[in-house]
Structures are given as structure tokens and as C-alpha cells.
């Protein structure tokens, strides 16, 4: 039976930038801080009804079903002489993996009947012996979390002597994503005897407590502190996973911490990098971090998430953006909604004004710490709060099935000192809108545009993904409501 421990230490000051271009997740004027800032197939017969595989968060965390759209996974093997199309490098069922019975029972309990497309290609490569590194890219909601968790569980040695010695380490950019991953491990490992899981994130427990767990999931700075204080024994580690790897390798501070953590681990460790996006300039760092890797990738055009209707609204000014947002409140609460803003100050101000006007909203940013952050995200997961205002701290990985709408109150943009104009952050846009429109459901992503620069950034995003973002005229509010309700009401009723 899986159990959980939690561990905490203070964060570590961020290091220097890893690349000339650094994207700041909260857009604050001050430099970013450490990780505390960052936040179905058919049944086996082929004839029965769809049995959803829950992805991202476990079912009790209200995770969404799997997004398994038609796309091609491109495979590049570390052994260049091997044929990536060889049947040895693909599976059609979990039974082909020869999983231990307790793990197979966990998959059945989670309604995992058949592997998703990314799992079909990733799992045989991940679980092969001797272990090989992997860099894997796939859309949000396609089973990435389940793939690396399955590999980890299959590699553990849970004898009484080793079950409390860390054998796998998962690094995530935020405490929210770390907690979500722990939920997936515990669900999949329900029947695995002797499994202990520890959460190593800031502000949790006694900072001098030793880590006694088979699997550790944490944020880079906290894990680095634990290792340096000799509270985390790395001797038996077999697998290192970076979830949302492009974000962590790119971000100032987080990237440095990931590199330092890896330098403190056994040289024979299997390194696995997963993300929905891997910009070309980050791929160079990824290959240095995980050398001689098998690589799974998608084209830009295949990354946009199916089932999401993308719209934009012309607003006359920043104040007009707020007025439109308030008008949107009735639509926001049909399901659950996330409003993404650029700065903590914007999040706090919008929350203050909307609450003062009698609306029920909550905000979550990197400035909120520890237990308070957990309480806010839990309220959003269980539906007590239906509208969440946040910065990019929640743009990645967080999976809540009831989210029917995402609002880009501020268009995500790159931090490019000296640039001639503001530049869109297409990768973050994709991660943001991926919080809605999960498998089998329809979602809406609405971007607010209030000036020429923001309009141009949206055009850049459309061009990058070869997609269309439809303009909605805010002068005819009845038409706006009609369009949005037509999209999200059937999905909300289906829930």
C-alpha cells in the first residue's frame, strides 16, 4: 500500500540565466525567485464503450480523461542504426510490458485499458534494459505522467531494506504539480506493497527531517537543499524525471538547480524529460542534460489542442478588459474557469475588485506560500471555487477536469530585453489553453486584446501553430454570450 511523507527545506537563491532568452512566468518587474514562485481507447474487445484513462491528476483529484487525438509521434533512437519502426519499440496493450501483478491491478483500478499513442511508443523504450535516457514531447493530456510513473514503479526494489531508500526522483516546477504527480503515483501504486512516496516542496514539515521513501517528488531547490544537508541519500537512485522539463531547463534559477541536483546523483541514473513543448533552443540543453537519449517529438502544427475553441476579444483599454471580464462572470461559472494574468499585482487587484462586487473568485500566485496554496488549489479542484485567477504558476501540468474556459487576460509574452517590440510566448499559450478542452470535452480559450502590440502577438501565435483564433465583437454582447454558451454548455451538461 502506497503511503506518503512530506519533506521541506527553505528555497535556494536563483543562479544566472541559462540562455539569452528567459521567459518570466509571472511577468513581475523584479527578477524571478526560486521554485516557490513557480507553481480513451475502446475496451479490450474493441466493441465495448469507451473506458477513459484519467490523465494528469488521479480520479479522486478530479483529473480529466485522456486526450488521444490523431497525431504522429516521431521517434529518434539513441542507437542510430536501429529501426524506430521495429515492433519491439511499440506496444498495443499494457500486458505486452510484462508488468508485475500489483502494478497491473493499479492500472485496472485507474481504468487504464489500452495505452495512449504516446504510451505505445514511450513505454517500450522507457522500460527496456539496460535503461536508456529519454526526451519526450506530447500534447497536454495524452498520458505523459502515467508513462513515467509506470516506468518508475517497474524499476523499484521494495525489499524491507530498500523500500525507504529513494530510488526515483521526480522534479516539477511547482508544488501544485508535485502534489498532483504524487496523487498519480499513489493511485497507480495502490496495490504495491512497501511503496513510500515523499513530497519535497517548500513549507511542509520539519526542515531537518530525513527523506525515507521509495519515490521522491519535489521542486529543484528543496531537493538540492536536502541532498546538500545529507538528508536525502542518493546512493540507490535509478530514475530521474523532469516533468515540464523545458520550463525548468529554461527558467533562470530552476535550470541551475536542476543541473546541480543532477550533478549530485549517480552517473548511471536513467534521465527522463517530459513536456508538451520543447523549443529548439531548449532542446540543446535537454540533450546535454540527458545525453544519448531516445527522442519522441511532434510538429508545431500537431501541438494545438483539439476540442478547444480559440477566440479573442477586442478591448478598448485595460479598464475595458476588466469590464468585459466582469460581464463574463456568468459564463465563467458554467463549469470552472482559469484567468491568466501577467503579474501578481494584477491577480490581487482583479480578485479584490470582483469580490467587492459580490463575485466568488480566488487567486493563486507565487507570492502565496505553503498550506495556503494547497487550500486554494483544493478548493478549485472540488468546485468550492469555480473561478481561479493566476499567473503562469499554474500554466503547466495542472489537470482539473471541470475547467471549461481559459481566459488570457494578458497575452503570454517573452522577456526579451532590448527587443524592438513585445513578443508572444507561444509555448506558454499552448500550456495555458491546455488546461481546458480535455479528452471527450469541449473548452473555450478567450484572449483579451487591447492594443496593436497584443493583436500582433496573437497573430504570431496563430502563425506558429498554423491555427485560427476567431475574433468576437464585444459591441454585441448577446452574440458573445450566444457563441460561448453554444460551445461550453453541452460539455458542462455532459459532466
Swiss-Prot record:
One of its GO terms (cellular component) is cytoplasm. Its EC number is 3.6.4.13. Residues 307-488 form the Helicase C-terminal domain. Its main location: cytoplasm. One of its GO terms (molecular function) is RNA binding. ATP binds at residues 138-145. GO terms for biological process: mRNA transport; protein transport. A motif (DEAD box) lies at residues 243-246. InterPro entries: DEAD/DEAH_box_helicase_dom, Helicase_ATP-bd, Helicase_C-like, P-loop_NTPase, RNA-helicase_DEAD-box_CS, RNA_helicase_DEAD_Q_motif. It is an enzyme of class 3 (hydrolase). Residues 1-10 have a biased composition (Polar residues). Residues 1-68 are annotated as: Disordered. It catalyses: ATP + H2O = ADP + phosphate + H(+). It is a peripheral membrane protein. Belongs to the DEAD box helicase family. DDX19/DBP5 subfamily. ATP-dependent RNA helicase associated with the nuclear pore complex and essential for mRNA export from the nucleus. May participate in a terminal step of mRNA export through the removal of proteins that accompany mRNA through the nucleopore complex. May also be involved in early transcription. This is ATP-dependent RNA helicase DBP5. The lineage of its organism: Eukaryota, Fungi, Dikarya, Ascomycota, Pezizomycotina.
